[in-house]
């Protein structure tokens, strides 16, 4: 671990604080990949329902290198990661698209897949620091005001090389005390928690589960959820999907609380996981099997609860890459081919759905629910804006399942650039990161 606390950095930090004071946590910040509550739901109003390169573009900046991470937004700062001149890097912009700082770190480890890069993992912030993670194993804490390095470490140098067949996809998550990274791969797999301020290792929990070949590999991001004392849960709980299992851990020490297996009953050796779990009230929702299944797990219990806590399973619907969004007891699922369904979290039954026009481009970005609408973005940079169903009767939908109403399309957005990052919605603005650009979309000032 390297501490960046030189006098020069200290002077820079003092100057930066004078110009930039972190704001308290607000619902209209977007601190991590899946938003303030890690559920794909954004706050705010006044978002546009259509855009193009010549319509509703507040600004667009060309990035100096490639990346696939989703921006983190806090107050006036927008942070993205990318590669710059062979280095892992991060850039901080203000809300007007002006570059405020850029920070180069260690040597970049290039991506293998045409959709991916060595900078796939999304940054996470608390408004004071921003933590960035890369395929190279580099994990760093930066000052969000000026990009000054607070500390750095490298997981692969500490714990062993990456054995994933493809490019790192998991993003770091924050608990009250730690920044946590999940490493799930063929061979040694683990969760590691580092002190947010100093970078010291707080705990490391092995996560070695019986899964064949590529099925042992996961690109998903854990979910941090407030524990329910009535269910015997700790104050903070970590939910992790990968290696044919969902596991829940005490975020204070990494110890496993419960596990559910059986997600790969036939032992398929290529069932790697990409989409992440999401928590819907009393249920953990786990998309799996390369987009073929969704499993709902009741929270609570101890040990192996596979036989007792699976609430329902859908084998006719799933999401391979996009992670579902959750709101008001409903789950919004977007498949890689643009089939979108809204499910009742308690029963798994479809309440309303739509199948977007077929296209050779897939959906990798995850859906976002905001201001009475849903935004889904295709890899060619085309987004569909749908009306979020505000009034649905689950029983009526079940009784008339062959005559379900479709989700209404409100508008389309186009940027004509490769897009796998998830849209970020903050304070009436949509920040869309493509492979080599950052767009800000909204009504003109």
Where do the protein language model's features map onto the residues?
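N-terminal secretory signal peptides that target proteins for export/translocation
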Residues: 1-9
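Intrinsic disorder/low-complexity segments
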Residues: 3-4, 17-18, 434
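Bacterial N-terminal signal peptides
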Residues: 8-21
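Noncatalytic, solvent-exposed loop/strand surfaces
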Residues: 23-445
